[in-house]
């Protein structure tokens, strides 16, 4: 095979590692029952031994670098719809009562009981996938989820305790907070001299767990460039557990948080040791010995359909309208309630993309700070690589940024940022890695001119081609055909055998419908949308006021609530193990609750 093209460049899927260091203990083999020790037995006459199946849990994967990404390719026994059902049936719901004179909700149950408060957070990409599947609007998809999780005709209609979720929040709320803090992080990084806890320039987004997994395991030199901010999922978990535990006087372990996401890799993110109450809670005996995850369980959009099917419920048959006031419980704090359940719309436009709009928000903030400036867009060698330059009124570049989606493009970005090779020969000049990378890419002469990577101020990086609406956990065409069997009969002219396998055209059309539903969230919203640049600064100011209020309310610094850290994951696969305690060390790593991917 030519050195210019390798098999890894043909697609974006990175399979699990060949060698898995998961230690599987087995009993010694049974001794032969034959009376004659010299008897020869043919292999086809030997009865196969029924060995117990090896089970690999999520925490085992966190301590191993044998696999670089694609958590959906690993058989995971935890964080599934089964865990949701088992938890709902295992713990009774903690009684809550609304007290109007005290501006919030009170806990009327026992703080020491085994009861739980069930809360959930839902990403907008999940609602878009449901909307495209059932032919409804994004807002109706929100009503569908609320009715299923909180309403009397949903989960509360069955189960051992008739449990449901008390609050279901939109991760867009915490996404807005992350956007505001991202703009601050980029600003401070540009003004910084390179010291302190700020990431190095260019700052790379850190909301995609598949990308973080890849960086921690294969390219540790990238880690100083990663944004220190939590993802909207993680920040939602920190917010819910910190506020509710303080306001209701319960332990964070009594608050069970479910996240519904478009991506399987979000399950790995939720299992990180850095994303537990140890990072933000006050030091106590419980938090030191038993860390409590900010997100207890993550299920995908497809698993949401499986969850409903397991309870014998049909999502499209649920009322597509808002829950009555009798089914809604006010949040314990009125100020936080008005922000958390705001009716205003979020910025989900074609320009911002389908992955949260981190890059777009940074550009809009800097454009608002520089009146008369304009954003110039330059497409890269494919649709998933886009460069942006903020030009002043005098046509001077003020800020350069880029968007890289998909692992093929991420690998090109990593090559650009890789440090130069240091020659061991005295007097030799360092050899830049980018030069060899460019020699492997002869097609660049026909592509749009690309930046060097180091001149970017910010890069939005996502593992999935096309962004988060194309996440691995989204509803596939096959799932949509099963959920709505008559939806494609009128338009499909293929035979049943041919129609069973979606064509690339059908897959692109499906993704286009999901994207359309995602972008239509603003038109479905009950609030008004302001597009003036000054509104961006005004909105960021309100978000900073909210973050300050949250931090002061629970008496925890914002640096402990909104920021996290990353670490290099070293692999023992293929290394010579001379020390006698290597196996014990691997067992210890595999038994950890987290600490890297």
Swiss-Prot record:
Q: Which residue intervals are annotated with compositional bias (Polar residues) in the record?
A: 432-444
Residues bound to [4Fe-4S] cluster 2 are 208, 263, 464, 468
- Which SUPFAM superfamilies does the protein's record reference? Fe-only hydrogenase
Region feature Disordered, mapped onto this chain:
25-46, 422-448
Q: Where does [4Fe-4S] cluster 1 bind?
A: 20, 61, 64, 67
GO MF annotations, alphabetized:
4 iron, 4 sulfur cluster binding; iron-sulfur cluster binding; metal ion binding
What Pfam families does the record tag this protein with?
Fe_hyd_lg_C
Q: Does the keyword 4Fe-4S apply?
A: yes
User: Which Gene3D superfamilies has this protein been placed in?
Assistant: Fe-only Hydrogenase (Larger Subunit), Chain L, domain 3 (3.40.950.10)
Q: Which GO terms describe its biological process?
A: iron-sulfur cluster assembly
Database matches in InterPro entries: Cytosolic_Fe-S_CAF, Fe_hydrogenase, Fe_hydrogenase_lsu_C
Keyword presence, Signal: no
Keywords in alphabetical order: 4Fe-4S, Iron, Iron-sulfur, Metal-binding
Function in brief = Component of the cytosolic Fe/S protein assembly machinery. Required for maturation of extramitochondrial Fe/S proteins. May play a role in the transfer of pre-assembled Fe/S clusters to target apoproteins.
Family assignment from sequence similarity: Belongs to the NARF family.
Protein name listed in UniProt: Cytosolic Fe-S cluster assembly factor NAR1
Q: What is the lineage of its organism?
A: Eukaryota, Fungi, Dikarya, Ascomycota, Pezizomycotina
Gene behind the chain: NAR1
